[in-house]
Amino acid sequence: MCGIVAYVGHREACPIVLKGLKRLEYRGYDSAGIALMNGGLNIFKRKGKVSDLEEFIADKDVHGHIGMGHTRWATHGEPNDVNAHPHYSSSKNIAIIHNGIIENYASLKQLLIEKGHTFQSETDSEVFINLIEDIKQNSNCTLAEAVRLALHEVVGAYAIVVLSKDDHNQLIAARKGSPLVVGIGEGEYFLASDATPIIEYTNDVVYINDYELVVIKNGELEIRTKEDVVQTPYVQRLEMALESIEKGGYPHFMLKEIFEQPRSILDSMRGRMIAESDHMMMGGIREFENKFVNAERIIIVACGTSWHAGLVAEYLIEDLARIPVEVEYASEFRYRNPILSERDIVVAISQSGETADTLAALELAKSKGATIFGICNVVGSSIARATDAGAYTHAGPEIGVASTKAFTAQVTVLSLIAMILGSKRGTLETTKLRQLMVELESIPAKVEKALELNDQIVQISEQYKDATNFLYLGRGYNFPVALEGALKLKEISYIHAEGYPAAEMKHGPIALIDQHMPVVVIATKDSSYEKIVSNIQEVKARKGRIIAVVTEGDTTIPAMADHVIEIPETSEHLVPLLSVIPLQLLSYHIAVMRGCNVDQPRNLAKSVTVE
């Protein structure tokens, strides 16, 4: 959660930090603040968005060449001016910004109060900075050393940046469990939660590892471990274009990202599959081919939209490769003492590569000897570095909090994995494999065609924007799509929505259906088509309003449904890549019509880096 930005160099820090906070606002937008060195250590902060902070400091002296900023997703303490970051220590000599949660903050706070420290906020972060100050005062050490020693005392997750009014040329930072990247420019340095605030100024970055301490002083960068061992920075080159994090003329990032899917799906398979030459290859799979081919089972761990992509993968891998698959919520998997062995492969799916629960699940699986495979979108992310092997989705930056292109990119990569494993295990006939390859190559063009439904979906959205409940139904490969469609709607429009396997409707949800209940049914031509036609008739018999997503040319369901959305025909195995498109557009347009903040829905953040 939370976004942090810092700068030290020859430029004015404030504009750089504010622009960076705007680019990180998808990580949290309850409150925002900056700290600047300009004749002292001065903090300016406000409840609300970065724009509220900008308005507050418009008449303030914000000159200075070293500064840091924070945009918050509240954990400890409600969103208000006092709980906003940065936080001073008791003496106001040092200040901190913090992304994460300090689990033992209560006991530390009580100890510090007994020592005479005072607190203004309800946050765990203020405890952290007072602990650092207490160590510095009592150990008579440097600030960098005090920060290092404090890391041994705190339990939890953190990415922090610390400033001191006694040193106008020093930034200190550290991380454990929350992302942190350092940008290296010409005589200047940038720190941020991810690379989006940095790429405008430099493409050279260092991804900081857990338990590492960063000291930037007098134009020099030094990285040490928590045990005080000096590390050699590994400088990587960013391959991200500035325009990829701009709206590009769209009213919202979410709509832009929905319409980017033909490209992001193509990029996710680019170089990995060429149907014409029967070429299929994925580096991470090739490296561990024997383990995958001989796996007793594959366990997929993920959260939210990535979990839905994992459910699609369960159908794909079991059908095409005949390997048992279990799909687990990472947040539950890590706490239930799962049975794992060296014959198991654990696949972690995460857009950001920083999801705290998924990372913890990986560490658990690794401790049991399982092979760990990661699927994520962000190069250099924690999951990418923690896994034995993996695959990037190449969807490009996704700024909208509600994932869209991340889902289809993940399903694309998972489809490739299922096809490769089916081929290697001999469970997928060559003829069928070639058919699937040709069909997958045609998906970007078919997504383009599905996006042409936008105007029709605007009209449907107008009729249902005031609904209070939605039901989404699907069978087989479309059941996870029903779950994803319901999640998208409730995430950004705040309408209660539930996704169900269509056959389960009779086991409870049918009691909810009346003339006021919109029911979205994904009813494409597949092996369960006749069954879902029956489910639609059951809904209509109870006066439910049917919005049906059907295969182009269907004549049966249009005679029963109130609204029909036709998508191009494709293989049953790949239909989620098309059937999800209208549901994304439906949720988007309903949210816009209800006046909701589509890109920054309430109470949510893009990257869930805390438990």
Identify the meaning behind each predicted range.
Residues 181-206, 331-365, 504-540, 570-584, ...:
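Glycine-rich, anion-gripping cofactor-binding loops and their flanking helix/strand elements
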Residues 1-247, 251, 260-296, 335, ...:
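Conserved short alpha-helical segments that host acidic/polar catalytic motifs at enzyme active sites
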Residues 65, 69-82, 276-289, 313-349, ...:
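Glycine-rich oxoanion-binding loops at beta->alpha junctions
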Residues 293-434, 439-442, 522-563, 586:
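Glycine-rich phosphate-binding loops that contact phosphosugars or nucleotide phosphates
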Residues 154-188, 460, 465-491, 526, ...:
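Acidic/histidine-rich
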Residues 261-265, 269-299, 389-518, 591-611:
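Active-site phosphate/pyrophosphate-binding segments
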Residues 228, 545, 558-560, 570-611:
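Generic C-terminus detector
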Residues 66, 94, 297-299, 345, ...:
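Structural motif
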